[in-house]
Amino acid sequence: MIWALAAACVLASVPAGLRWLRVAQREHYLAGAVATFAGRWWTNGPINVALLVVMLIGLVGSWWSPWWGFLVPLAQVGPVGLTMKGRTSPLAWTARLRRVAVLAALIAVAVYWGGVALESGFFIGIGLFLLPALIDLALLALGPVERRMGNRWVDQAAARLEASGAKVVAITGSYGKTTTKLYAAHLLAGAFRTVASPASFNNRMGLARAINEQLAPGTEVFVAEMGTYGRGEIEELTEWIPPDVAAMVAIGPVHLERFRSEERIVAAKAEILDRARVGVIAVDHPLLAALAEERGREMEIMTVSGEGGAARVTIRDSAIEVDGVWVAKAPPDVFKANLAVAIGIGLALGLGIDDLISRLDGLPRAEHRQTVSRSERGFTVIDDTFNSNPAGARAALGVLDRVGDGGRKVVVTPGMVELGQSQDGENRAFAHQAAAIADHLVIVGGTNRRALLEGSGKDNASVTVVASRDEAVDWVRENLGPGDAVLYENDLPDHYP
């Protein structure tokens, strides 16, 4: 009987393991993420909760009889909704994923073998139940190995960057990094041969790849977006990508799940200033204003503001001012704080304000960030689906409030994530604001369903709940027409419940 239970658990581990490996890959191989998502999935909806209860009953019963242990592999038909293939993010069998899969499989087999040796149905069942944690253990064990394997590409990138002689502009922030990078690269391209890191290539291996593949001979400025999930990451990046100019765009409750506080976010991101000649800091947030004052005692700081605050570069309404003097009118629908930082970067690199102002026309726009278009059916579409944050979501609602031709207004959203303990409150507040502007709210998925329903419940907007973005898009197509407008606010990948 023990052998049969072990065989059943091994067989059940294959589809279950593929599901959780996909989560690991989508979460950038961060140890601990798989178990976190397992907790979310097994408590999402009555069916998954029922399957979780079945597994727990099987584990408890297996203390007395191995027969009870068979409930654990049977329950691996769940969690319902998390597929092996994926809709938006299919499993990609990269070399790194294969290494994780092999090590996780070896750990799981060792646990099952231990259960057989001890003749313990519980020990075998707990191995399958804790499969997400075993994958996290494999990720943790392989972390140093992956880092050493990546050193070759990092060393090559560092040598290539040094040989180019290019000046480095490094940009970080809780949000707005990519848009600021695009603005800065556009403004600088009028005077320098400029290369910017593509898309959201903002970590160690992404930036190494960007430099190795895109930094051509003759490049004069390299604009690097730098992200972080914790202290020390940006410090390590600046060791081999030393910035001449370092910019901090914005601070907000993004990735609070990992950082725990905005003060810790500032401390981690402020590492970008340590090796820079000039720092450009958007001082609209009190923590960044305090940082600018503190760092200004030891290095040159260019203060900027997108909200008309006291700073060297400020955008007040639509007026761009430098050192208190009006210099130009900002283009419509521009992200003001991001533009202020980009102008500050140009000034820090020695460009004249006239050179920068002459490049304002044609500022690029990052994809899926408050992009306004018109559908074939004649309704207005606002696409703000990339990495939603509270400030950006409020701004997107302002866009929805301004557009449309008198028809219905709809908000489609799964809510915001990685906001730590403030996540429920921020989503309730967003739903409340959305209900005040929109006629209809379409809630996607289960991650923030309860908070969004609570936030919208006291207002006049009607609510529809759907399981996936595809269902939400179908609803919009069936219900909206000419004169209507829809805001798509955030789009969670389908490894979220």
Range-by-range predicted roles:
Residues 1-144, 347-354, 358-368, 372-497:
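ATP-dependent carboxylate-amine ligase
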Residues 3-283, 287-297:
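Phosphate-binding loop of NTP-binding sites
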Residues 172-175, 198-199, 226-227, 250-251, ...:
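Fold-independent oxyanion-binding glycine-rich loops
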Residues 179, 202-205, 232, 337, ...:
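Residues that form or flank phosphate/diphosphate-binding pockets in enzymes
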Residues 184, 188, 207-211, 339-349, ...:
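Buried hydrophobic packing segments
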Residues 202, 229-232, 260, 334-337, ...:
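Charged, alpha-helix-enriched surfaces in structured cytosolic catalytic cores
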Residues 202-203, 306-313, 468-474:
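A short acidic, often aromatic-flanked loop/helix-cap motif at beta-alpha or helix-coil junctions
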Residues 248-380, 405-407, 432-440, 446-463:
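Acidic, Mg2+-coordinating active-site environments of NTP-dependent enzymes
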